[in-house]
Protein backbone atom coordinates (compact mmCIF):
# COMPACT_ATOMS: atom_id res chain seq x y z
CA UNK A 1 0.00 0.00 0.00
CA UNK A 2 2.82 2.39 0.88
CA UNK A 3 4.62 1.58 -2.39
CA UNK A 4 1.40 2.02 -4.40
CA UNK A 5 0.60 5.37 -2.79
CA UNK A 6 4.16 6.55 -3.38
CA UNK A 7 3.96 5.47 -7.03
CA UNK A 8 0.69 7.36 -7.52
CA UNK A 9 2.23 10.47 -5.97
CA UNK A 10 5.04 10.22 -8.51
CA UNK A 11 2.97 9.47 -11.61
CA UNK A 12 -0.04 11.70 -11.04
CA UNK A 13 0.70 15.40 -11.63
CA UNK A 14 0.72 17.64 -8.60
CA UNK A 15 -1.96 20.33 -8.42
CA UNK A 16 0.57 23.16 -8.63
CA UNK A 17 2.43 21.59 -11.60
CA UNK A 18 -0.07 23.10 -14.06
CA UNK A 19 -1.18 26.73 -14.20
CA UNK A 20 -3.78 28.08 -16.67
CA UNK A 21 -1.66 30.82 -18.23
CA UNK A 22 -3.59 33.63 -19.98
CA UNK A 23 -3.60 33.53 -23.79
CA UNK A 24 -1.53 36.11 -25.59
CA UNK A 25 1.29 38.28 -24.37
CA UNK A 26 1.33 40.00 -20.98
CA UNK A 27 3.76 41.92 -18.79
CA UNK A 28 5.34 40.01 -15.90
CA UNK A 29 7.78 40.61 -13.06
CA UNK A 30 10.01 38.03 -11.44
CA UNK A 31 13.20 37.36 -9.51
CA UNK A 32 16.13 35.57 -11.16
CA UNK A 33 17.01 32.36 -9.31
CA UNK A 34 19.30 30.68 -11.87
CA UNK A 35 20.89 31.26 -15.27
CA UNK A 36 22.27 28.97 -17.97
CA UNK A 37 24.04 29.59 -21.26
CA UNK A 38 23.54 28.10 -24.69
CA UNK A 39 25.35 28.97 -27.94
CA UNK A 40 22.88 31.69 -29.05
CA UNK A 41 20.65 32.40 -26.07
CA UNK A 42 20.54 32.58 -22.30
CA UNK A 43 17.99 30.68 -20.21
CA UNK A 44 16.89 32.42 -17.04
CA UNK A 45 14.81 30.81 -14.31
CA UNK A 46 12.43 33.35 -12.77
CA UNK A 47 10.25 33.11 -9.69
CA UNK A 48 7.00 34.99 -10.26
CA UNK A 49 4.73 36.03 -7.43
CA UNK A 50 2.99 34.55 -5.62
CA UNK A 51 4.62 31.18 -6.32
CA UNK A 52 5.33 30.17 -9.93
CA UNK A 53 8.65 29.28 -11.54
CA UNK A 54 9.14 30.12 -15.23
CA UNK A 55 12.03 29.49 -17.59
CA UNK A 56 12.59 32.43 -19.95
CA UNK A 57 14.79 32.48 -23.06
CA UNK A 58 16.71 35.73 -23.53
CA UNK A 59 18.98 37.01 -26.26
CA UNK A 60 22.63 36.33 -25.45
CA UNK A 61 24.36 39.69 -25.08
CA UNK A 62 26.26 41.71 -22.49
CA UNK A 63 23.07 42.68 -20.65
CA UNK A 64 21.72 39.16 -20.20
CA UNK A 65 25.20 37.81 -19.37
CA UNK A 66 25.38 40.26 -16.45
CA UNK A 67 22.24 38.87 -14.81
CA UNK A 68 22.78 37.18 -11.45
CA UNK A 69 20.58 35.43 -8.86
CA UNK A 70 18.53 38.01 -6.98
CA UNK A 71 18.06 40.40 -9.90
CA UNK A 72 14.50 41.39 -10.79
CA UNK A 73 13.17 41.57 -14.35
CA UNK A 74 10.11 42.99 -16.03
CA UNK A 75 9.39 41.30 -19.35
CA UNK A 76 6.65 40.98 -21.92
CA UNK A 77 5.91 37.57 -23.40
CA UNK A 78 3.38 34.78 -23.61
CA UNK A 79 3.93 32.13 -20.96
CA UNK A 80 2.93 28.60 -21.92
CA UNK A 81 3.09 25.23 -20.21
CA UNK A 82 6.34 23.27 -20.69
CA UNK A 83 6.41 21.26 -23.92
CA UNK A 84 8.86 18.91 -25.61
CA UNK A 85 10.91 20.40 -28.42
CA UNK A 86 12.11 17.17 -30.05
CA UNK A 87 9.26 14.70 -30.44
CA UNK A 88 11.68 11.93 -31.51
CA UNK A 89 13.76 12.06 -28.33
CA UNK A 90 13.10 9.62 -25.50
CA UNK A 91 13.92 12.32 -22.99
CA UNK A 92 10.73 13.96 -21.71
CA UNK A 93 11.99 17.52 -21.30
CA UNK A 94 8.58 18.90 -20.32
CA UNK A 95 8.18 16.35 -17.52
CA UNK A 96 11.74 17.08 -16.38
CA UNK A 97 10.93 20.79 -16.10
CA UNK A 98 7.74 20.09 -14.16
CA UNK A 99 9.56 17.79 -11.73
CA UNK A 100 12.00 20.64 -11.11
CA UNK A 101 9.16 23.02 -10.31
CA UNK A 102 9.07 24.90 -13.64
CA UNK A 103 5.43 25.42 -14.59
CA UNK A 104 5.87 27.73 -17.60
CA UNK A 105 8.23 28.75 -20.39
CA UNK A 106 8.50 32.04 -22.24
CA UNK A 107 10.42 33.29 -25.27
CA UNK A 108 11.34 36.82 -24.21
CA UNK A 109 14.45 37.53 -26.31
CA UNK A 110 15.10 41.28 -25.91
CA UNK A 111 11.74 42.45 -24.52
CA UNK A 112 12.85 42.78 -20.92
CA UNK A 113 14.40 45.26 -18.54
CA UNK A 114 16.29 44.91 -15.30
CA UNK A 115 14.59 46.53 -12.31
CA UNK A 116 16.28 48.46 -9.51
CA UNK A 117 17.87 46.80 -6.49
CA UNK A 118 15.13 48.17 -4.23
CA UNK A 119 12.43 46.52 -6.35
CA UNK A 120 14.44 43.29 -6.46
CA UNK A 121 14.75 43.24 -2.67
CA UNK A 122 11.04 43.96 -2.28
CA UNK A 123 10.06 41.14 -4.63
CA UNK A 124 12.53 38.72 -3.02
CA UNK A 125 11.09 39.42 0.43
CA UNK A 126 7.64 38.37 -0.78
CA UNK A 127 8.77 34.97 -2.06
CA UNK A 128 7.98 31.78 -0.10
CA UNK A 129 10.57 30.94 2.54
CA UNK A 130 11.85 27.92 0.61
CA UNK A 131 12.42 30.08 -2.46
CA UNK A 132 14.22 32.67 -0.32
CA UNK A 133 16.54 29.98 1.05
CA UNK A 134 17.33 28.73 -2.44
CA UNK A 135 17.90 32.29 -3.62
CA UNK A 136 20.30 32.95 -0.73
CA UNK A 137 22.27 29.81 -1.64
CA UNK A 138 22.37 30.87 -5.31
CA UNK A 139 23.66 34.32 -4.37
CA UNK A 140 26.35 32.83 -2.14
CA UNK A 141 27.40 30.38 -4.84
CA UNK A 142 27.51 33.16 -7.45
CA UNK A 143 29.64 35.37 -5.18
CA UNK A 144 32.13 32.56 -4.57
CA UNK A 145 32.37 31.72 -8.27
CA UNK A 146 33.16 35.36 -9.06
CA UNK A 147 36.32 35.06 -6.95
CA UNK A 148 37.68 32.72 -9.59
CA UNK A 149 37.48 35.49 -12.21
CA UNK A 150 40.72 37.17 -11.15
CA UNK A 151 42.57 33.93 -10.37
CA UNK A 152 41.67 31.85 -13.43
CA UNK A 153 41.82 33.88 -16.68
CA UNK A 154 40.54 31.15 -19.03
CA UNK A 155 36.75 31.08 -19.35
CA UNK A 156 36.81 27.35 -20.09
CA UNK A 157 38.94 26.47 -17.06
CA UNK A 158 36.90 28.78 -14.82
CA UNK A 159 33.64 27.18 -15.94
CA UNK A 160 34.94 23.70 -15.11
CA UNK A 161 36.36 24.86 -11.78
CA UNK A 162 33.07 26.50 -10.77
CA UNK A 163 31.10 23.38 -11.68
CA UNK A 164 33.49 20.97 -9.99
CA UNK A 165 33.87 22.86 -6.70
CA UNK A 166 30.66 24.91 -6.34
CA UNK A 167 28.06 23.17 -8.48
CA UNK A 168 27.73 26.35 -10.58
CA UNK A 169 27.23 24.86 -14.05
CA UNK A 170 25.63 27.77 -15.90
CA UNK A 171 28.94 28.68 -17.62
CA UNK A 172 29.46 25.20 -19.02
CA UNK A 173 29.23 25.23 -22.80
CA UNK A 174 27.98 22.36 -24.93
CA UNK A 175 31.56 21.75 -26.06
CA UNK A 176 32.75 21.24 -22.47
CA UNK A 177 29.86 18.92 -21.65
CA UNK A 178 30.50 16.88 -24.80
CA UNK A 179 34.22 16.56 -24.03
CA UNK A 180 33.62 15.33 -20.49
CA UNK A 181 30.82 13.02 -21.59
CA UNK A 182 32.87 11.43 -24.39
CA UNK A 183 35.80 10.97 -22.01
CA UNK A 184 33.55 9.22 -19.48
CA UNK A 185 33.98 11.73 -16.63
CA UNK A 186 30.75 13.71 -16.88
CA UNK A 187 30.15 12.85 -13.20
CA UNK A 188 32.89 15.32 -12.24
CA UNK A 189 30.74 18.22 -13.45
CA UNK A 190 27.81 17.19 -11.23
CA UNK A 191 28.57 17.38 -7.52
CA UNK A 192 28.16 13.98 -5.91
CA UNK A 193 29.54 11.67 -3.25
CA UNK A 194 33.01 11.88 -4.81
CA UNK A 195 33.24 15.61 -4.18
CA UNK A 196 31.72 15.48 -0.71
CA UNK A 197 33.90 12.49 0.18
CA UNK A 198 37.01 14.48 -0.71
CA UNK A 199 35.91 17.35 1.53
CA UNK A 200 35.08 14.99 4.43
CA UNK A 201 38.48 13.30 4.03
CA UNK A 202 40.27 16.64 4.30
CA UNK A 203 38.16 17.61 7.31
CA UNK A 204 38.78 14.39 9.22
CA UNK A 205 42.51 14.64 8.54
CA UNK A 206 42.61 18.22 9.82
CA UNK A 207 40.50 17.40 12.88
CA UNK A 208 42.26 14.14 13.75
CA UNK A 209 44.05 15.66 16.81
CA UNK A 210 40.63 16.38 18.37
CA UNK A 211 39.72 12.68 18.32
CA UNK A 212 41.91 11.81 21.30
CA UNK A 213 39.20 12.78 23.79
CA UNK A 214 35.44 12.26 23.86
CA UNK A 215 34.57 16.03 23.86
CA UNK A 216 37.08 16.62 21.06
CA UNK A 217 35.64 13.77 19.01
CA UNK A 218 32.12 15.14 19.47
CA UNK A 219 33.29 18.61 18.38
CA UNK A 220 35.08 17.18 15.33
CA UNK A 221 32.06 15.22 14.11
CA UNK A 222 29.63 18.06 14.79
CA UNK A 223 31.88 20.42 12.83
CA UNK A 224 32.07 17.85 10.03
CA UNK A 225 28.27 17.58 9.95
CA UNK A 226 27.98 21.37 9.80
CA UNK A 227 30.43 21.62 6.90
CA UNK A 228 28.75 18.72 5.06
CA UNK A 229 25.32 20.34 5.09
CA UNK A 230 26.67 23.85 4.53
CA UNK A 231 28.41 22.58 1.39
CA UNK A 232 25.24 20.78 0.28
CA UNK A 233 23.21 23.96 0.83
CA UNK A 234 25.61 26.30 -0.98
CA UNK A 235 25.90 23.95 -3.97
CA UNK A 236 22.13 23.91 -4.44
CA UNK A 237 21.01 20.77 -2.57
CA UNK A 238 21.18 18.66 -5.71
CA UNK A 239 20.10 15.04 -5.49
CA UNK A 240 23.59 13.43 -5.54
CA UNK A 241 24.77 15.92 -2.92
CA UNK A 242 21.72 15.24 -0.73
CA UNK A 243 22.28 11.50 -0.99
CA UNK A 244 25.96 11.84 -0.18
CA UNK A 245 25.32 14.29 2.66
CA UNK A 246 22.79 11.92 4.22
CA UNK A 247 25.19 8.97 3.94
CA UNK A 248 28.16 10.83 5.41
CA UNK A 249 25.98 12.23 8.19
CA UNK A 250 24.93 8.70 9.13
CA UNK A 251 28.55 7.56 9.06
CA UNK A 252 29.56 10.43 11.34
CA UNK A 253 26.77 9.58 13.78
CA UNK A 254 27.81 5.91 13.77
CA UNK A 255 31.45 6.81 14.40
CA UNK A 256 30.43 9.21 17.15
CA UNK A 257 28.78 6.29 18.94
CA UNK A 258 31.81 4.03 18.30
CA UNK A 259 29.73 1.86 15.99
CA UNK A 260 30.58 0.61 12.52
CA UNK A 261 27.77 1.71 10.24
CA UNK A 262 26.64 -0.49 7.36
CA UNK A 263 27.20 1.37 4.11
CA UNK A 264 24.34 -0.35 2.27
CA UNK A 265 21.91 0.45 5.08
CA UNK A 266 23.02 4.08 4.97
CA UNK A 267 22.53 4.17 1.20
CA UNK A 268 19.01 2.72 1.35
CA UNK A 269 18.07 4.94 4.30
CA UNK A 270 19.21 8.04 2.42
CA UNK A 271 17.19 6.91 -0.61
CA UNK A 272 14.14 6.37 1.58
CA UNK A 273 14.43 9.82 3.18
CA UNK A 274 14.83 11.55 -0.20
CA UNK A 275 11.82 9.74 -1.69
CA UNK A 276 9.67 10.49 1.36
CA UNK A 277 10.45 14.20 0.98
CA UNK A 278 10.24 14.21 -2.84
CA UNK A 279 8.70 11.05 -4.38
CA UNK A 280 9.03 12.49 -7.89
CA UNK A 281 12.78 11.93 -7.65
CA UNK A 282 12.11 8.26 -8.37
CA UNK A 283 11.64 9.10 -12.06
CA UNK A 284 14.74 11.31 -12.24
CA UNK A 285 17.55 9.82 -14.31
CA UNK A 286 20.03 11.55 -12.01
CA UNK A 287 18.54 9.79 -8.99
CA UNK A 288 18.72 6.40 -10.69
CA UNK A 289 22.29 6.89 -11.95
CA UNK A 290 23.47 8.24 -8.62
CA UNK A 291 22.20 5.33 -6.56
CA UNK A 292 23.17 2.69 -9.11
CA UNK A 293 26.77 3.89 -9.16
CA UNK A 294 27.09 4.01 -5.36
CA UNK A 295 25.36 0.63 -4.98
CA UNK A 296 27.78 -0.94 -7.46
CA UNK A 297 30.80 0.55 -5.67
CA UNK A 298 29.62 -0.77 -2.31
CA UNK A 299 28.98 -4.23 -3.76
CA UNK A 300 32.46 -4.57 -5.29
CA UNK A 301 34.38 -3.21 -2.29
CA UNK A 302 34.78 -6.73 -0.79
CA UNK A 303 36.97 -7.55 -3.81
CA UNK A 304 39.68 -5.31 -2.32
CA UNK A 305 41.07 -8.23 -0.32
CA UNK A 306 42.56 -9.63 -3.55
CA UNK A 307 45.11 -6.81 -3.72
CA UNK A 308 45.17 -5.48 -0.15
CA UNK A 309 48.74 -6.74 0.35
CA UNK A 310 50.22 -4.49 -2.35
CA UNK A 311 52.06 -1.26 -1.60
CA UNK A 312 49.89 1.75 -0.81
CA UNK A 313 50.20 3.57 -4.19
CA UNK A 314 49.20 0.40 -6.06
CA UNK A 315 46.29 -0.20 -3.68
CA UNK A 316 45.10 3.37 -4.24
CA UNK A 317 45.36 2.95 -8.03
CA UNK A 318 43.54 -0.40 -7.89
CA UNK A 319 40.79 1.17 -5.74
CA UNK A 320 40.39 3.96 -8.27
CA UNK A 321 40.14 1.54 -11.21
CA UNK A 322 37.80 -0.82 -9.35
CA UNK A 323 35.35 1.89 -8.28
CA UNK A 324 35.44 3.67 -11.66
CA UNK A 325 34.81 0.42 -13.51
CA UNK A 326 31.99 -0.60 -11.14
CA UNK A 327 30.21 2.74 -11.43
CA UNK A 328 30.53 2.88 -15.22
CA UNK A 329 29.40 -0.72 -15.79
CA UNK A 330 26.44 -0.34 -13.42
CA UNK A 331 25.18 2.80 -15.11
CA UNK A 332 26.08 1.88 -18.72
CA UNK A 333 22.72 0.29 -19.71
CA UNK A 334 20.70 3.19 -18.29
CA UNK A 335 23.03 5.80 -19.82
CA UNK A 336 22.78 4.07 -23.20
CA UNK A 337 18.99 3.81 -22.90
CA UNK A 338 18.56 7.51 -22.04
CA UNK A 339 21.33 9.15 -24.07
CA UNK A 340 22.30 6.61 -26.74
CA UNK A 341 26.09 6.78 -26.18
CA UNK A 342 28.73 4.92 -24.17
CA UNK A 343 32.29 6.18 -23.51
CA UNK A 344 35.05 3.62 -24.17
CA UNK A 345 38.13 5.16 -22.54
CA UNK A 346 36.58 6.04 -19.17
CA UNK A 347 39.26 4.17 -17.17
CA UNK A 348 42.08 6.09 -18.86
CA UNK A 349 40.28 9.38 -18.21
CA UNK A 350 39.52 8.65 -14.55
CA UNK A 351 43.13 7.72 -13.72
CA UNK A 352 44.05 11.39 -14.19
CA UNK A 353 40.69 13.12 -13.63
CA UNK A 354 39.97 11.80 -10.12
CA UNK A 355 43.39 12.79 -8.63
CA UNK A 356 42.95 16.21 -10.27
CA UNK A 357 39.52 16.47 -8.62
CA UNK A 358 41.12 15.80 -5.22
CA UNK A 359 43.71 18.52 -5.76
CA UNK A 360 41.21 21.01 -7.20
CA UNK A 361 38.74 20.60 -4.33
CA UNK A 362 41.49 20.78 -1.72
CA UNK A 363 43.01 23.81 -3.42
CA UNK A 364 39.61 25.51 -3.69
CA UNK A 365 39.03 24.98 0.03
CA UNK A 366 42.36 26.65 0.82
CA UNK A 367 41.65 29.35 -1.78
CA UNK A 368 38.38 30.42 -0.13
CA UNK A 369 39.52 30.02 3.49
CA UNK A 370 42.68 32.09 2.96
CA UNK A 371 41.11 34.64 0.62
CA UNK A 372 41.87 37.52 3.06
CA UNK A 373 45.60 36.87 2.44
CA UNK A 374 46.24 38.14 -1.12
CA UNK A 375 49.63 36.43 -1.54
CA UNK A 376 48.32 32.99 -0.56
CA UNK A 377 45.15 33.45 -2.58
CA UNK A 378 47.18 34.38 -5.66
CA UNK A 379 49.42 31.34 -5.25
CA UNK A 380 46.39 29.03 -4.84
CA UNK A 381 44.70 30.67 -7.81
CA UNK A 382 47.71 29.99 -10.04
CA UNK A 383 47.72 26.37 -8.91
CA UNK A 384 44.00 25.99 -9.59
CA UNK A 385 44.36 27.55 -13.03
CA UNK A 386 47.22 25.18 -13.91
CA UNK A 387 45.39 22.07 -12.66
CA UNK A 388 42.09 22.90 -14.35
CA UNK A 389 43.89 23.66 -17.61
CA UNK A 390 45.83 20.38 -17.41
CA UNK A 391 42.63 18.43 -16.68
CA UNK A 392 40.81 20.00 -19.62
CA UNK A 393 43.76 19.37 -21.93
CA UNK A 394 43.98 15.71 -20.90
CA UNK A 395 40.27 15.09 -21.39
CA UNK A 396 40.23 16.87 -24.76
CA UNK A 397 43.07 14.62 -25.89
CA UNK A 398 41.37 11.42 -24.67
CA UNK A 399 38.02 12.40 -26.18
CA UNK A 400 39.71 12.89 -29.56
CA UNK A 401 40.88 9.27 -29.72
CA UNK A 402 39.23 7.14 -32.42
CA UNK A 403 36.32 4.89 -31.49
CA UNK A 404 35.96 6.73 -28.17
CA UNK A 405 32.16 6.63 -28.13
CA UNK A 406 29.83 3.75 -28.93
CA UNK A 407 26.41 4.77 -30.25
CA UNK A 408 23.93 2.30 -28.76
CA UNK A 409 20.42 2.92 -27.46
CA UNK A 410 18.72 -0.20 -26.07
CA UNK A 411 14.99 -0.27 -25.46
CA UNK A 412 13.31 -0.70 -22.06
CA UNK A 413 13.20 -4.52 -22.36
CA UNK A 414 16.88 -4.77 -23.29
CA UNK A 415 17.84 -2.42 -20.45
CA UNK A 416 15.84 -4.44 -17.92
CA UNK A 417 17.46 -7.65 -19.20
CA UNK A 418 20.92 -6.12 -18.78
CA UNK A 419 20.26 -5.36 -15.13
CA UNK A 420 18.59 -8.73 -14.60
CA UNK A 421 21.67 -10.43 -16.02
CA UNK A 422 23.93 -8.35 -13.76
CA UNK A 423 21.91 -9.27 -10.66
CA UNK A 424 21.96 -13.00 -11.47
CA UNK A 425 25.70 -12.90 -12.24
CA UNK A 426 26.39 -11.24 -8.88
CA UNK A 427 24.14 -13.76 -7.16
CA UNK A 428 26.01 -16.60 -8.89
CA UNK A 429 29.35 -15.10 -7.81
CA UNK A 430 28.26 -15.00 -4.17
CA UNK A 431 26.53 -18.40 -4.23
CA UNK A 432 27.67 -20.50 -7.23
CA UNK A 433 24.89 -22.66 -8.65
CA UNK A 434 24.37 -24.19 -12.10
CA UNK A 435 20.73 -23.04 -12.12
CA UNK A 436 21.80 -19.41 -11.76
CA UNK A 437 24.32 -19.92 -14.54
CA UNK A 438 21.56 -21.34 -16.75
CA UNK A 439 19.40 -18.34 -15.94
CA UNK A 440 22.28 -16.08 -16.99
CA UNK A 441 22.48 -17.86 -20.34
CA UNK A 442 18.71 -17.52 -20.84
CA UNK A 443 18.81 -13.79 -20.02
CA UNK A 444 21.82 -13.23 -22.28
CA UNK A 445 20.06 -15.06 -25.12
CA UNK A 446 16.87 -13.09 -24.59
CA UNK A 447 18.85 -9.85 -24.54
CA UNK A 448 20.57 -10.78 -27.82
CA UNK A 449 17.28 -11.73 -29.50
CA UNK A 450 15.64 -8.51 -28.28
CA UNK A 451 18.52 -6.48 -29.67
CA UNK A 452 18.33 -8.21 -33.05
CA UNK A 453 14.56 -7.71 -33.30
CA UNK A 454 14.92 -4.00 -32.52
CA UNK A 455 17.29 -3.44 -35.45
What are these regions (language model features)?
Residues 30, 77, 164, 192, ...:
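Divalent metal-coordination and catalytic microenvironments
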Residues 37, 152-156, 239, 262, ...:
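Proline-centered turn/helix-capping motifs that create local helix->coil transitions or kinks
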Residues 63-78, 96-97, 102, 117-119, ...:
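Non-globular, low-confidence helical/coil segments that flank catalytic cores
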Residues 19-28, 40-48, 120, 126, ...:
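Juxtamembrane/interfacial segments around transmembrane helices
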Residues 2-187:
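Membrane-interface helix/helix-cap signal primarily in integral membrane proteins
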Residues 106, 173-346, 408-454:
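Hydrophobic alpha-helical transmembrane segments in multi-pass membrane proteins
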Residues 132-134, 138-139, 166-171, 235-240, ...:
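Hydrophobic alpha-helical transmembrane segments
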Residues 295-403:
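Alpha-helical transmembrane segments of multi-pass integral membrane proteins
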Amino acid sequence: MVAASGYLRVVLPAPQSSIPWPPGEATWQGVVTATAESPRSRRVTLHLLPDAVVQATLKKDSLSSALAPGDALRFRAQIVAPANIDSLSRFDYAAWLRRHGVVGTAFVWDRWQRLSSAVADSLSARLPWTARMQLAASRWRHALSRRYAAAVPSDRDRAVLSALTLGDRHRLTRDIRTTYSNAGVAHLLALSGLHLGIIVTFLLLLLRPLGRTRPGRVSAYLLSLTVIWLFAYVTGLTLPTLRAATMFSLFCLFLLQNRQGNALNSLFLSAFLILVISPSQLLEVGFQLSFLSVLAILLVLPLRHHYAGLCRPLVWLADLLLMSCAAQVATAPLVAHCFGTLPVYFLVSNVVAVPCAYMLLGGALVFFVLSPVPAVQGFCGDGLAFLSGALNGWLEWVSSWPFGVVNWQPGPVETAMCYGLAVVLWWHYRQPDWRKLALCIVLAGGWAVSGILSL
